[in-house]
């Protein structure tokens, strides 16, 4: 039987309607977070797409020392808690160390392990021990079949609900490529799989002191991923991505999101009807 992860009234599974995980790359302040959450909630409600709000309190792996990291865990969790209570929506955010897991789990519904940290055993253990859903991004350096080792670690440490995310693989210097086989291979582990459509177009360190990206390919890759038959799409969204503090070149402009989601719903419906 294929694994389905349940979160409140949302069911996350590779054979079910896709779930949207979206929000700005980092938490920029309470007003901005509430603005983005409200817009995304209204849009996904209108389109009948299950929605999980995402934003990060700390971008701990910025390219340069000059990169803006975010508001930090205390202020960030306070804002995410406000978003959750205001809109009654599930929340996902990143954790970067064992010490962050317990406090973060008090607020959010899903703990996300960043791609660069996907093999860090102590971090996986700490996340699993919270009892929360754990979503792991496959490292850009890791083969999809090697995610079975990540799965085994989490299961040994007690994790019951696991999600895996594809976010591209290293393709030479400052470039990533999306191998759609990865989605099918990770699905064979009986884990719901999510495709990160925005980080997959990232050009790591491509601007010297920061990462670049090719936003124009986000929709194309999202359509391809949905056509495989997956559990969710992850997209970072901003009302003014070119002036966002991080990952602007990859993020989708809020005004363009609706048209993309309408197309993805059609692709998702056809794919799962055929299967």
From Swiss-Prot:
It comes from the Bacteria. It is an enzyme of class 2 (transferase). It holds the Pfam family DAHP_synth_1. GO terms for cellular component: cytoplasm. One of its GO terms (molecular function) is 3-deoxy-8-phosphooctulonate synthase activity. The keyword Hydrolase does not apply. GO terms for biological process: keto-3-deoxy-D-manno-octulosonic acid biosynthetic process. Keywords: Cytoplasm, Lipopolysaccharide biosynthesis, Transferase. Pathway: Carbohydrate biosynthesis; 3-deoxy-D-manno-octulosonate biosynthesis; 3-deoxy-D-manno-octulosonate from D-ribulose 5-phosphate: step 2/3; Bacterial outer membrane biogenesis; lipopolysaccharide biosynthesis. It is found in: Cytoplasm. The keyword Repeat does not apply. Its main location: cytoplasm. Its EC number is 2.5.1.55. It catalyses: D-arabinose 5-phosphate + phosphoenolpyruvate + H2O = 3-deoxy-alpha-D-manno-2-octulosonate-8-phosphate + phosphate. Belongs to the KdsA family. HAMAP family: KDO8P_synth. PANTHER family: PHOSPHO-2-DEHYDRO-3-DEOXYHEPTONATE ALDOLASE. This is 2-dehydro-3-deoxyphosphooctonate aldolase. It comes from Rickettsia prowazekii (strain Madrid E).
């Amino acid at each position: 039987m294929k694994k389905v992860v349940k979160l409140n009234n949302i069911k996350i599974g590779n054979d079910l309607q896709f779930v949207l995980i979206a929000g700005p790359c980092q938490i920029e302040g309470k007003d901005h977070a509430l603005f983005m959450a409200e817009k995304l909630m209204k849009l996904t409600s209108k389109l009948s797409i299950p929605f999980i709000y995402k934003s990060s309190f700390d971008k701990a792996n910025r390219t340069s020392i000059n990169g803006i990291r975010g508001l930090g865990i205390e202020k960030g969790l306070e804002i995410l808690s406000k978003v959750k209570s205001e809109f009654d929506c599930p929340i996902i955010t990143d954790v970067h160390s064992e010490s962050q897991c317990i406090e973060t789990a008090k607020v959010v519904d899903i703990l996300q392990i960043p791609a660069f940290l996907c093999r860090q055993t102590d971090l996986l253990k700490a996340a699993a021990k919270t009892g929360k859903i754990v979503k792991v991004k496959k490292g850009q350096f890791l083969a999809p079949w090697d995610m079975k080792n990540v799965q085994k670690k989490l299961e040994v440490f007690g994790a019951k609900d696991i999600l895996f995310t594809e976010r591209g693989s290293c393709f030479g210097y400052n470039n990533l490529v999306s191998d759609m086989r990865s989605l099918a291979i990770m699905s064979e582990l009986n884990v719901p799989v999510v495709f990160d459509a925005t980080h997959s177009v990232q050009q790591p360190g491509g601007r010297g002191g920061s990462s670049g990206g090719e936003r124009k390919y986000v929709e194309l890759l999202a359509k391809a991923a949905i056509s495989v038959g997956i559990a969710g799409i992850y997209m970072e969204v901003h009302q003014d991505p070119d002036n966002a503090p991080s990952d602007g070149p990859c993020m989708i402009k809020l005004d363009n999101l609706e048209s993309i989601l309408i197309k993805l719903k059609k692709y998702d419906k056809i794919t799962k009807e055929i299967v």
